[in-house]
Swiss-Prot record:
The gene is Bud23. It comes from the Eukaryota. Residues 212-231 have a biased composition (Polar residues). This is 18S rRNA (guanine-N(7))-methyltransferase. InterPro entries: Bud23-like (IPR039769), Bud23_C (IPR022238), Methyltransf_11 (IPR013216), SAM-dependent_MTases_sf (IPR029063). May be ubiquitinated and targeted to degradation in response to pro-inflammatory cytokine signaling. PANTHER family: 18S RRNA (GUANINE-N(7))-METHYLTRANSFERASE-RELATED (PTHR12734:SF0), METHYLTRANSFERASE-RELATED (PTHR12734). S-adenosyl-L-methionine-dependent methyltransferase that specifically methylates the N(7) position of a guanine in 18S rRNA. Requires the methyltransferase adapter protein TRM112 for full rRNA methyltransferase activity. Involved in the pre-rRNA processing steps leading to small-subunit rRNA production independently of its RNA-modifying catalytic activity. Important for biogenesis end export of the 40S ribosomal subunit independent on its methyltransferase activity. Locus-specific steroid receptor coactivator. It is an enzyme of class 2 (transferase). Its EC number is 2.1.1.-. Its main location: nucleus. It catalyses: a guanosine in 18S rRNA + S-adenosyl-L-methionine = an N(7)-methylguanosine in 18S rRNA + S-adenosyl-L-homocysteine. The keyword rRNA processing applies. It comes from Mus musculus. Keywords: Chromatin regulator, Cytoplasm, Methyltransferase, Nucleus, Ribosome biogenesis, rRNA processing, S-adenosyl-L-methionine, Transcription, Transcription regulation, Transferase, Ubl conjugation.
Amino acid sequence: MASRSRRPEHSGPPELFYDQNEARKYVRNSRMIDIQTKMTERALELLCLPEGQPSYLLDIGCGSGLSGDYISEEGHYWVGIDISPAMLDAALDRDTEGDLLLGDMGQGVPFRPGSFDGCISISAVQWLCNANKKSDVPARRLYCFFSSLYSALVRGARAVLQLYPENSEQLELITTQATRAGFTGGVVVDFPNSAKAKKFYLCLFSGPSTSLPKGLTESQDADQASESMFTSERAPHKKARRDLVKKSREWVLEKKERRRRQGKEVRPDTQYTGRKRKPRF
């Protein structure tokens, strides 16, 4: 978990770092858009939302609405909160479908109890570990965030927070405050042996503790194992998935693989997978 030489959190408060120039990158830079979309896709997988029905989700640190676009594509509704006016302006210019709120997650999420079916956050939570003024106490701000988030979720819902911890001490600080607020769960690490593609997802449960999903490895998903491949390959993949004949062998295999990525128990594939049963008399 080696820290980079120059982390954005060390440059100052997020509302100043994410100015108009930075917001422009999140709208025009195809590389950043691709990475953000893939991490959002993975976060939704880990949420394990009910299939075939829309959910109401909260996006913490929504920025220019890139994650929200994917949420909308999947048929869900969302509300986004961000501390940067420039990023929210970029989201408005892009006509994102979700509702947007300017706010500091370190002061809590201002929603009624049980408002959301789930929560995602991409590359935001680690900002709470830095004190930009004397009154900022990271542990206190983290607890305020997690306790208010716990309240805003329906009982049994999940929150999946992708983050870039600077070191193991910072990750422990975050998980400790989440547990103190009432959450169960843990950290899922995708591609742990890859320096570039390694990703941390804090998977939190607001109900009884369940088995933690397993992290992806290079052998499971080679396309996601490298951040150097930034093309439009994902779009035809989604189209191909929609074109699969329902109940066909390919459709069944794709559905089973998706459930494995969500951490669910799935029976092994065999030569009989996807075969129709013969009628019995």
